[in-house]
Every structure is written in structure tokens, then in C-alpha cells.
């Protein structure tokens, strides 16, 4: 509602425009990150949670012959190499007027 001044909401307006970050593509294709988040300590939990999506994991394996967990772990490792940690997720900040900041926002 911050950009819709004629819309009345029961919620408070944010202090300013909220920055937007795009997440890495599934296989890292055509994605140039601006920010990385070290996920080394969380890698096992993230993979465990990912494998809870049985319908997607099984479908990708049966339909495309893709081990989904192995694929994302590989891209996380690659992104980790790029920023000097074991595993990382990559993001790209949306660079538009009023969305920039002078401080780091991601963990």
C-alpha cells in the first residue's frame, strides 16, 4: 500500500520502500548475484526440508532423471566458491529508484 496512497489499509505503511531481492535460478543459469548468504551451517537442514517436497522430488527424478537435492547442493557449493564459503545462496538486488540502500540487508 506504500505506493497506493488512495488505498486505505488497516495495516501501517512501511517506513520506506522495501528492497526487493531475486533468488538464484534453479541451475544458476544467466544469474549474476549481487549478494550471497552463507548457508554452510544450515545445509543439512535445508536439504532435509527440500526432501519433504516428495511430489516434486519424485516427479523430477521420474520425469527428468534429476536428483533435485543433488542439483541444488551443487549450485549452493558453486555459489559458495564464488564468495569464499562452503555453501551459499545467491541473490540479486532489484536496482531501481528508491530501492537501494547503503547497508547490507541479508544475513
PLM region descriptions:
Residues 1-107:
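Metal-dependent de-N-acetylase/amidase catalytic core
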